[in-house]
């Protein structure tokens, strides 16, 4: 089975727009800025054999605040510039019937089924409590990127890091401590 690093998008891979202490996705492709160090961090994880999968809530599309075309253009840029294996997107708003909207683990469970991923040997990296809740619900090791937002963490992450560069180093170290698993 494969190991994966699941990554939130806004605030982890690209710069989030922060207003009054709360993060928002960039509204336009011109505002979409990949954070420093992200490319190198992802290359190291890719070279170590991890699948790299973005799992992102984009409810502004359902709310009519952003077009799906703009989100897809941002994702084309990510695919062109970063060594990503997949991008899972939940375009829904939070509701009891949504299976994909984080903190529900639907996007991670779907990726695990499609790509034969061992979630217990995988990681979820995010900058909001929803990401940590999602990773925990899926059975992943969770890493919180602390951006200092004015919101409370609902779930305790396994580790807190300053950015994806630090998170990547932690993942590579943590994974090196894991006993080798033989395929049968």
Language-model regions: role of each:
Residues 15-17, 91, 146:
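Residue-level signal for short segments within beta-strands and strand-turn junctions
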Residues 38-71, 75, 84-96, 135:
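Substrate-recognition element of Asp-dependent hydrolases with the DxDx(T/V) motif
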Residues 26-29, 59-63, 95-99, 155:
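Conserved short-loop catalytic and cofactor-binding motifs
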Residues 14-16, 21, 63, 133, ...:
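Conserved protein kinase catalytic core
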Residues 7-9, 56, 126-127:
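Active-site flanking residues adjacent to catalytic metal/cofactor-binding acidic residues
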């Amino acid at each position: 089975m494969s190991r994966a690093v699941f990554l939130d998008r806004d605030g982890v891979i690209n710069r989030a727009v922060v207003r009054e202490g709360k993060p928002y996705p960039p509204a336009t492709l011109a505002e979409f800025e990949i954070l420093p160090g992200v490319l190198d961090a992802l290359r190291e994880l890719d070279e170590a054999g991890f699948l790299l999968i973005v799992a992102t809530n984009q409810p502004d599309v359902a709310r009519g605040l952003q077009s799906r075309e703009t989100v897809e253009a941002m994702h084309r840029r990510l695919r062109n510039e970063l060594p990503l294996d997949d991008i899972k997107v939940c375009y829904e708003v939070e509701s009891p019937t949504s299976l994909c909207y984080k903190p529900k683990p639907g996007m991670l469970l779907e990726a695990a089924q499609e790509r034969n991923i061992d979630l217990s040997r995988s990681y979820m990296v995010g900058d909001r409590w929803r990401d940590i809740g999602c990773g925990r619900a899926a059975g992943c090791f969770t890493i919180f990127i602390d951006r200092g937002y004015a919101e409370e963490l609902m779930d305790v992450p396994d580790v807190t890091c300053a950015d994806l560069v630090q998170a990547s180093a932690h993942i590579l170290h943590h994974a090196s401590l894991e006993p080798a698993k033989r395929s049968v």
